[in-house]
């Protein structure tokens, strides 16, 4: 991971913690930060470990969005857990931390271009449309561990034989 980006990420994390300490009038431990999330997820918060993991490839491609949105998003999960205990991941407690404490819109998903991190996908079909399935889901179908169904017509999806990416 780029040293400068890593430093900026830690600064943003520390600023978020400082804002939370001021808002809740208590101290919070500084979370550990790693850069080992893969796939399409931008980041993950591990509540019991007080750890934030970020996707290094998406971070390098979208540094400003990570610093302004993704890192506060993940820190807000940790703060909500430490203040309120087990709550819904994007529930009112988390939204309150995002909007009232961090002054960041409480968005639950990112809109980054994921072409550089997207794994292989395979085309599946039902009675009304086609679906791209990830390699993980495709392999579960092949091993007969899962059957996926269309959300519209409820028919089981079947592999067309085409790899999309």
Curated annotation (Swiss-Prot):
Listed InterPro entries: SprT-like_domain, SprT_Zn_ribbon, Uncharacterised_SprT
Domain SprT-like: 21-158
Keyword Nucleotide-binding: no
GO molecular function, one term: zinc ion binding
Keywords recorded for this protein, A-Z: Cytoplasm, Metal-binding, Zinc
SMART domains hit by this protein: SprT (SM00731)
Keyword Cytoplasm attributed: yes
Sites where the protein binds Zn(2+): 73, 77
A GO BP entry: response to stress
Subcellular location: Cytoplasm
Primary localization class, coarse: cytoplasm
Cofactor list: Zn(2+)
CC cofactor note: Binds 1 zinc ion.
NCBIfam families tied to this protein: PRK04860.1
Classification via PANTHER family: PROTEIN SPRT
Protein's name according to its UniProt entry: Protein SprT
Native source species: Vibrio campbellii (strain ATCC BAA-1116)
